[in-house]
Regions:
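Generic hydrophobic, helix-prone segments enriched in Leu/Val/Ile
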Residues: 8-11, 49, 63
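Acyl-donor (CoA/ACP) binding surface of acyl/acetyltransferases
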Residues: 1-43, 70, 74-189
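A short helix-loop-beta-strand connector motif used in the catalytic cores of GNAT acetyltransferases and
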Residues: 60-72
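Conserved GNAT-fold acetyl-CoA-binding loop/helix
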Residues: 40-61
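Juxtamembrane/interface motifs at transmembrane-helix termini
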Residues: 51-54, 63-65, 76, 102-104
Length: 189
């Protein structure tokens, strides 16, 4: 039986109506740095990048060293790189993963993140054979929860004192968790 990783390797590119999800390369560094260096854009995701070199290093360590289940989000109409989406915490035995995403704030509120999320969810259940996907967001970032809801995920629970904020020293984060099982996905398709 084909492993989850072999199945993922077969889908380096996913196309949607307005997007191309494709491997991230060092050529994406400047476009990624545009949002990765913006404190408002990275507020709830990862530490704000301080230099283009830091962004290049992050691309090499995160996307190039381990590319399976990680895609850059590109606008089909212009070829512009606008964000990333990934399946992480992959568990090949239980066939579950966590979805994470970030998009340049110039493209917020246009349904693009939801479109990318739906495409990854469809791939995970229909092609890869996943059993469960989850996602979480900082309680102070309800817009991310709306993406999860619009993508078919359901609220699971709140986790108080889940972690320390990466951008605001001393702040405890409450994470809001969403989940979608294969049974729920196919029942609502």
């Amino acid at each position: 039986m084909e492993s989850l990783f072999i199945k993922l390797a077969k889908y380096p590119i996913i196309k949607t109506e307005r997007l191309v999800l494709r491997p991230v390369t060092l050529d994406d560094a400047e476009a990624m740095f545009e949002y990765a260096s913006d404190k408002e854009n990275t507020r709830y995701t990862f530490p704000t990048n301080q230099s283009l070199e830091e962004t290049k290093n992050n691309i090499a360590q995160f996307y190039l060293a381990s590319p399976l289940g990680r895609w850059g989000i590109e606008l089909k109409s212009t070829g512009e790189f606008i964000g990333t989406i990934d399946l992480h915490k992959l568990d090949a035995v239980l066939k579950k993963a966590t979805i994470g995403y970030i998009i340049n704030q110039k493209y917020w509120n246009q349904g693009l993140t939801t479109e990318a999320n739906r495409a990854v969810i469809e791939l995970a259940f229909e092609k890869i054979g996943m059993n469960k996907l989850d996602a979480f967001h900082d309680k102070d970032n309800p817009a991310s929860g709306k993406v999860m809801e619009k993508s078919g995920m359901r609220f699971s629970h709140e986790e108080l004192y889940a972690r320390m904020d990466k951008n605001e020293p001393g702040r405890f984060v409450t994470d809001v968790h969403y989940v979608l099982t294969k049974e729920e996905y196919f029942a609502n398709k």
